[in-house]
Amino acid sequence: SSAASDVYKRQELTPRASKLLNVTAEQVEKQYMDLAIERKIILKQMEDQTQIYAASFYYMEANTATMLKRLNVSYDVSDAEIEQRIRGIEKKSGMTLDEHQVTAVKEAVRNGLLVITGGPGTGKTTTINTIIRYFELEGLEIFLAAPTGRAAKRMSETTGFEARTVHRMLELNGGAEGSGGFERDESNPLEADVIIVDEMSMVDISLMYSLLKAISVGTRLILVGDVNQLPSVGPGSVLRDIIQSHACNVVMLTKIFRQASTSDIIVNAHKINHGEEVILDNKSMDFFFLKRYDADVIINVVLQLIKQKLPKFVDATPYDIQVLTPMRKGLLGVERLNGILQRYMNPPANDKVEKEYGSTVFREGDKVMQTKNNYQLAWEIRTKFGLTVDKGLGIFNGDMGIIRQINDFAEQMIIEFDEGRMVEYPYKLLDELELAYAITIHKSQGSEYPAVVIPLLGGPMMLMNRNLLYTAVTRARKCVTLVGNEVTFQQMIRNTSQQKRYSGLCDRLKEN
């Protein structure tokens, strides 16, 4: 199973482990006791069953719960005072808030810990912007952060304030063997009065734990996210657990605003999320479904869309248009699609140097993606005259780039990642790089593209669920085109079975 659960149920783990390791159930049970004595695992009795935790996750969850509760202090500010200030901000900025958004601002002012959740078009950005302006008027120091570079960049664009990755805010120091230790922790906390973290659905338990260690009591923490996105790649489902535990105040934004209700991307995303029928008559301006039932036919349609139709339609380059697919393997999987798309978008040429690595050929001009967090890679942003404007460490899982140069002599590539970060990328790290003309929907989380194209033709039930479809559709700013079988599409909307993730954070938050 995926390592995304941080707790297992004994009656499920024992038969699975004994089958996997080809040993008897008794032998597995004996191991539990030995490991518990060595403090490698924790056995915890919950109601009628035993839960088994890796010790490191158990302590992380227990400490995360303790720290969250500690931050959850309340401040006494009157309704009238907050409302008066909101009205002033609305006047100045031309924004108007609905009652849910006003509630969110009030809760942010009155609580040390708050969760704000809502889908696309429900006014999260306006709410965050009002909260920022509010605390700014109080003269408070505000930090904005998001789990990925792309999400942080988006947050900067929508708020007009500098947002950083959580890693950068915590001052990543490379740590032992590049594991990524942070300069900021309980002995050197963040000097902020208010910290707002966006795209919380992507934050896993270990990043949450590191973040909380660096926040001192008296700092307000506001967590913003869309709980219906796919859960984080790493273990746990932090945002969902905090919401379900009722351990702190949560404001849910549900109303779709008028300007958003003309967008079928947003309207259909909410229909998918509620399990309602989506009309596929292609009368839309930004949501299309092209019915095709053969993998190769689908691929040809995808190629035409990227190269000819969509760039003009959304005013973007073919490189900006992202193909998102559910799977890695198979006729419409990432691996096969990348091979085909590469030939079509960046064909071989005499003046393009290539580097073969495993079954992939990397070529100058290729669109690529980093697939692991690498805390050691140095990057620089330079002006066109070669002056360094900014530099730093770390290229993270999901960062996209273009290969500008391949240098066999130096055994490295020059890759330009998002935001113009130039990296000397050594061949020995090519394991962490892959072509990115097509990427999995999971990898697209937290990113936004002018247009996305989603091939859909069957797939394993476990994977093809509502959250996956919802995440894919909400990646597009201007246009979503699905190409494939509408039956698969309808099945995904109906399939609400998410792979069950057990995690103990919700239980820990409910304790005492």
Indicate residue ranges for each PLM-predicted region.
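Short, small-residue-biased leader/transition segments that mark boundaries at the very start
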Residues: A3-Y8
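Interdomain "pre-motor" coupling segment immediately N-terminal to P-loop NTPase/helicase cores
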Residues: S18-E81
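N-terminal pre-P-loop "Q-motif" helix
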Residues: M95-V109
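Hydrophobic anchor at the beta1->P-loop junction of P-loop NTPases
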Residues: I116, L144
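Conserved lysine of the Walker
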Residues: K124
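Conserved helicase motor core of SF1/SF2 NTP-dependent helicases
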Residues: T130, Y134-L140, A146-S156, H167-G174, ...
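Conserved helicase motor core of P-loop NTPases
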Residues: V227-L393
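C-terminal accessory regions
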Residues: V389-G392, N397-N512
